[in-house]
Amino acid sequence: MSNTHPFVGEKISYEKGLQFWDDFSEHYSNRQQGDIPCRIIDRLFETGMLTEDCNVLEIGSGPGTYSLELAPRVRSVRCLDSSPRMLMRLMSKASESGIGNIVPVEADWNSYEDGSEYGCCIATLCPGSGSRESVARMEKLSNGSCVLVSWTCNHGDDLNAQVWKALGKDYGYGFRGSTEVQDRLSSEGRDVKVELFQTDIEMDIPVEELVAKEVSSFKAYGNNMDVSDIVRSILEPDADDGIVHFRATNEMKLIYWAV
């Protein structure tokens, strides 16, 4: 798979990249992560990176995949995200679940300022969170631990790469297999721990649901091309009465260290 992210190939500006996630928020799903978020949080408690009296800063909280699991087990979670729609989804779910210790913050992490200290700063699938600058900000705000969660393999994105290929663009997500972040953190003297988590995903998805997701994605890129026919041409040969039987093993990476 190509290592060129569509953002890079299409020369999407930083500001448009932020807007992408707000525009795409309705179709953003945690289904491809399976039970990994729960297992990661359990592991962070086992290792002492998280404790019950911990105030947590989550960077890139999205609609609450990790926040909603974290909040009942810690003192508080401050959820930072640049997308107001993502935060609306998060707070709606928190209200439905009776969770009252989540504080939503609509802000861009790269310009965020906070005079507080947190027992743990955790970045969950937040683009660029492993950069030197981002890690330095995380460590400045944490008096306990720092955590990075990222994909190494998400087969849910294979369709997106196939659509780009049909358009003559060689884009993909092969860069997720890189060890650059943990290698750099270790070389700079941190006692970094790295663990991989796999999950088997099995689900039946209507073709039209996947069509709507990809159409939304391409609109968010600012591309007015209607890719619906391309998506259908990819999916329908293997679909069963309009249903795609999705089966895959996905993998995520957990990086953590004490500050």
For the regions a protein language model found, what residue spans apply to each?
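Short alpha-helix
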Residues: 174-189
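Class I SAM-dependent methyltransferase SAM/SAH-binding core
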Residues: 63-110
